[in-house]
Curated annotation (Swiss-Prot):
Major site of localization recorded for this protein: cytoplasm
Oligomer status and interactors: Homodimer.
Protein location: Cytoplasm
Any one GO CC term of the record: cytoplasm
Protein name: Chaperone protein HtpG
Keywords per UniProt: ATP-binding, Chaperone, Cytoplasm, Nucleotide-binding, Stress response
Protein purpose: Molecular chaperone. Has ATPase activity.
Location of region: B: 337-552
C: annotated segments: 553-624
PANTHER family attached to this UniProt entry: HEAT SHOCK PROTEIN 90 FAMILY MEMBER
Length: 624
């Protein structure tokens, strides 16, 4: 063979092969699904390229994948007449993994085989799955549009290296031959191979054929029998497609091992004509938070595959949705640039977004347990929605779930509709608090009065929550109110103050002035409050000022953070406040005020500028 060379696998490939062979062995038959799926993709790519270059078909436009086996040689071969590969493409696709974040993904793998199996399945094993059942894999391929002597040979035993060389191949496409390991004879059984193809590949539009041999008049006659329906699943009516077929098709397009949570199959006619098949996965992809994570729908135009990962049809906060759209209105030569500026795309995006939100609303209504699975996997992503999509903000708000003082659990199970249904008579606002953790939110002194009054508070502790709430201003006509803000509605909740208490407060006015003078412009204001029951003091911000949590978000993003000026609120009924007010010695008075302020700031921010000074001051006051 000409141009033969032996090359080493990229280190990640070696690691993936090892993990895959051991983790996926219990579900080893999926290798055939993966290889047929790749062949289907190769046919799709050829059809697309041939739209502008019909000569790529080379007079052979009947695309198919063929499966054959040789019991004597113990080989199984999967051959297609799709797009094929050049030498450079073979090295890129079969010698390396081009996915960003692969190294981090592999490092995250543990020793739990069931968990590893799910993770690797999520990653998408594709071609490498052949090594689950084969101890050697041989590939012969010729790219469409090149001469017969520009074909490529690739071979590996799945260890540390592979061989690549130039060969001659008359027909276009890729032929993969698996040299089966000892003990894998089931894949040389005609009935077994047929049943696997029927199970996993019935929905593929590409005909999958199996070799049949018949002895006639002393001659062996070879023919090819189509095994699958070979009709694009989404073109069939919903009543014709079983749940198992929908699930199998999802696994084909998503390269996922797990069943989807739900799906929606719709054909729309009228002003715009299109078919959509949208799926909600049951688990998040391993690289969902990776900047380079590819997402979007498969795009077909008049049943011709155009592109993968067409992100223009789904907003970013729904990037977990998998599926396809088949449009009759877009041109066959559509590009990503044309999609970006097309009014057809914008209309389709709007319709598909509404479809997904309706699908999720139905899931939440019909199966709370499944919806909770969805929320645990994708809730953080959905929380990006109120900021990104003001047109659908109300629909998104219905889908949000929160922890709450009502459930006394960190689990985010409470909907806004649940909250509103439990609002007290005369309660006009939906109260919430944001914090760094559920524990910090739950124990915040800002909740004291509301707990006493039996008023529910939503406990928000995800990093995105403060940002989300800056866009989400009301639900069902009820305004949202942060309990960490200085708001009249919170003061009004306090019991009516009797005359003697009013007189006591009046007597504390000089004390409040002393505190103001001492603290100067370090705080925005000093005042007495009736919002507290057990805590001597808190700090709050005005409704129109940046909150503590938002300031933390800015800082984490490396942005300049404007100074937050707090309102210092003191509980006139607390013994520490009374003791401070009675202190005449100015030095002692200063220490007590500083201690109260530090306590309030620490409760609000979780940190202090000078914690050592705080400890020194507290120790000194404890022994004085």
């Amino acid at each position: 063979m000409k141009g033969q060379e032996t090359r080493g696998f990229q280190s990640e490939v070696k690691q993936l092969l090892h993990l895959m062979i051991h983790s996926l062995y219990s579900n080893k038959e999926i290798f055939l699904r993966e290889l047929i799926s790749n062949a289907s993709d190769a046919a799709d790519k050829l059809r697309f390229r041939a739209l502008s270059s019909p000569d790529l078909y080379e007079g052979d436009g009947d695309l198919r994948v063929r499966v054959s086996f040789d019991k004597d040689k113990r080989t199984l071969t999967i051959a297609d007449n799709g797009i094929g590969m050049t030498r450079d493409e073979v090295i890129d696709h079969l010698g390396t993994i081009a996915k960003s974040g692969t190294k981090a993904f592999l490092e995250s793998m543990g020793s739990d085989q069931a968990k590893d199996s799910q993770l690797i399945g999520q990653f998408g094993v594709g071609f490498y799955s052949a090594f689950i059942v084969a101890d050697k894999v041989t590939v012969r391929t010729r790219a469409a549009g090149v001469s017969a002597d520009e074909a490529v040979f690739w071979e590996s035993e799945g260890e540390g290296e592979y061989t690549v060389a130039d060969i001659s191949k008359a027909d276009r496409g890729t032929e993969i031959t698996l040299h089966l390991r000892e003990g894998e004879d089931e894949f040389l059984n005609d009935w077994r191979v047929r049943s696997i193809i029927s199970k996993y590949s019935d929905h593929i539009a590409l005909p999958v054929e199996i070799e049949t041999r018949e002895e006639k008049d002393g001659e062996t006659i070879v023919s090819w029998e189509k095994i699958n329906k070979a009709q694009a699943l989404w073109t069939r009516s919903k009543g014709e497609v079983s749940d198992d077929e929908y699930k199998a098709f999802y696994k084909h397009i998503a390269h996922d091992f797990t069943d989807p949570l739900t799906w929606s199959h719709n054909r729309v006619e009228g002003k715009q004509e299109y078919t959509s098949l949208l799926y909600i996965p049951s688990q998040a992809p391993w690289d969902m938070w990776n900047r380079d994570h590819k997402h979007g729908l498969k795009l077909y135009v008049q049943r011709v595959f155009i592109m993968d990962d067409a992100e223009q049809f789904m907003p970013n906060y729904l990037r977990f949705v998998r599926g396809l759209i088949d449009s009759n209105d877009l041109p066959l030569n559509v590009s990503r640039e044309i999609l970006q500026d097309s009014s057809i795309t914008r209309n389709l995006r709007s319709a598909l977004t509404k479809r997904v939100l309706q699908m999720l609303e139905k899931l939440a209504k019909d199966d709370a347990e499944k919806y909770q699975t969805f929320w645990k996997q994708f809730g953080l992503v959905l929380k990006e929605g109120p900021a990104e999509d003001s047109a659908n903000q109300e629909a998104i708000a219905k889908l949000l779930r929160f922890a709450s003082t009502h459930t006394d659990s960190a689990a985010q199970t409470v909907s806004l509709a649940d909250y509103v249904s439990r609002m007290k008579e005369g309660q006009e606002k939906i109260y919430y608090i944001t914090a760094d953790s559920y524990a910090a939110a739950k124990s915040s002194p800002h909740l004291e009065l509301l707990r006493k009054k039996g008023i529910e508070v939503l406990l928000l502790s995800d990093r995105i929550d403060e940002w989300m709430m800056s866009y989400l201003t009301e639900f069902d006509g009820k305004a949202f109110q942060s309990v960490a803000k200085a708001d009249e509605s919170l003061e009004k909740l306090a019991d009516e103050v009797d005359e003697s208490a009013k007189e006591a407060e009046k007597a504390l006015e000089p004390f409040v002035e002393r505190v103001k003078t001492l603290l100067g412009d370090r705080v925005k204001e000093v005042r007495l409050t009736h919002r507290l029951t057990d805590t001597p003091a808190i700090v709050t911000t005005d409704n129109d000022e940046m909150s503590t949590q938002m300031a933390k978000l800015f800082a984490a993003a490396g942005q300049a953070v404007p100074e937050v000026k707090y309102i210092f609120e003191l509980n006139p009924d607390h013994q520490l406040v009374k003791r401070t007010a009675d202190t005449q010695d100015e030095a002692q008075f200063k220490e007590w005020v500083e201690l109260l302020l530090d306590q309030a700031l620490f409760a609000e921010r979780g940190t202090l500028e000078d914690p050592n000074q705080f400890i020194r001051r507290m120790n000194q006051l404890l022994v004085s």
